[in-house]
């Protein structure tokens, strides 16, 4: 069996009668699906535990995600292979705490609010692959290393170091954020995953059958960057927003790397190094996108390639 614990925010205030109505429907639905657990309403926050067969629990949570009465759903814990239920006698025990002592309610609301906010903040700083592990009930620290082929994308801002010395910290930060926002949105829209930000640089990856999607991501990012430049208005630095992109394809090792102090879920391999070198060549060639030969060979569209010859990659044997 599987168990999921989540917290969410009610989209509107609920009276005791409205909550009781929700409780009755919840009991009926969960009884039919043989899902047990507990549902707590404290102020504007729902806290719920669902337990049962995996397919039934997943379907129940998916239904809740589409329920307009819930927003900001944060999955706190997922457990698999449970041998027994924690709430075997309840189809869905419901608890309404809003009529309890005001001091207790205030403390509970603060706790749930802080929990939801902390979770949201951590999600913003956490690798999507790590979040998926957690939501699937897998400890990322125990996940095995996997060797697989990936399309690696590196992107960075042209002349960033030079521009940084002439403008305020706020303008430089806004400049970098605008670029990273454009590229990140394009990456996710095309099915890729942003792996990390490194100052003005971004590293992302795609599955090997998404070579053309990765190229489209670069082209769409450049188009959006041109749009931002043409609409710079009073934003001085935006007039100088240019970027370079490098693509490589090859085997990498994906997993958690680091130390006892800090871990990073990322990818390692020669393809990563090659993609980083590719983006550096955009400066000397005057081309906004540089790809290595295996990317070109794996693409299925006619991209009107321009052969620029062979380049010696620093650190490569040949």
List each model region and its residues.
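Charge-rich, low-complexity N-terminal segments
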Residues: 1-154, 162
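Short beta-strand
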Residues: 37-42, 193-197, 237
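A short glycine-enriched loop-to-beta-strand structural element that forms part of the catalytic core
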Residues: 74-76, 80-84, 238-256
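Catalytic NTP-binding/metal-coordinating core of nucleotidyl cyclase/transferase enzymes
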Residues: 142-213
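Alpha-helical scaffold within the catalytic cores of cyclic-nucleotide enzymes
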Residues: 177-189, 208-245, 249, 274-279
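Catalytic/regulatory signature loops of cyclic-dinucleotide turnover enzymes
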Residues: 248-249, 270-293
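Short, surface-exposed loop/helix-turn segments at secondary-structure junctions
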Residues: 257-269
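Cytosolic regulatory/linker segments at or just downstream of nucleotide-handling modules
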Residues: 284-318
């Amino acid at each position: 069996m599987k168990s999921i614990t989540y917290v969410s925010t009610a989209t509107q205030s609920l009276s005791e009668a409205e909550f009781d109505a929700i409780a009755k429907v919840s009991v009926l639905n969960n009884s039919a699906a043989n899902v047990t657990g507990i549902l707590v309403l404290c102020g504007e926050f729902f806290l719920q535990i669902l337990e049962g067969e995996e397919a039934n629990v997943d379907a129940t949570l998916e239904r809740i995600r589409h329920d307009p009465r819930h927003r900001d759903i944060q999955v706190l814990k997922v457990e698999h292979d449970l041998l027994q239920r924690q709430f075997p006698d309840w189809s869905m025990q419901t608890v309404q705490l809003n009529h309890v002592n005001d001091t207790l309610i205030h403390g509970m609301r603060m706790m749930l609010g802080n929990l939801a906010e902390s979770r949201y903040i951590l999600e913003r700083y956490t690798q999507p692959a790590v979040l998926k592990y957690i939501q699937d009930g897998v400890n990322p620290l125990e996940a095995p290393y996997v060797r697989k082929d990936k399309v690696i994308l590196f992107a960075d801002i042209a002349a960033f170091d030079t521009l940084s010395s002439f403008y305020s910290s706020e303008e430089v930060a806004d400049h970098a954020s605008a670029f990273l926002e454009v590229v990140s949105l394009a990456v996710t829209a095309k099915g890729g995953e942003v792996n990390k930000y490194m100052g003005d640089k971004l590293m992302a990856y795609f599955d090997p059958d998404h070579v053309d999607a990765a190229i489209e991501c670069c082209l769409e990012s450049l188009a959006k960057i041109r749009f931002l430049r043409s609409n710079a208005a009073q934003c001085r630095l935006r007039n100088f927003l240019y970027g370079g992109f490098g693509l490589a394809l090859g085997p990498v090792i994906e997993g958690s790397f680091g130390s006892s102090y800090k871990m990073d879920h990322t990818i390692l391999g020669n393809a990563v190094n090659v993609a980083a070198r590719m983006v550096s060549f955009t400066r000397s060639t005057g081309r906004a996108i540089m790809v290595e030969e295996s990317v070109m060979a794996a693409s299925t569209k006619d991209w009107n390639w321009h052969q620029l010859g062979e380049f010696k990659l620093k650190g490569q044997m040949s």
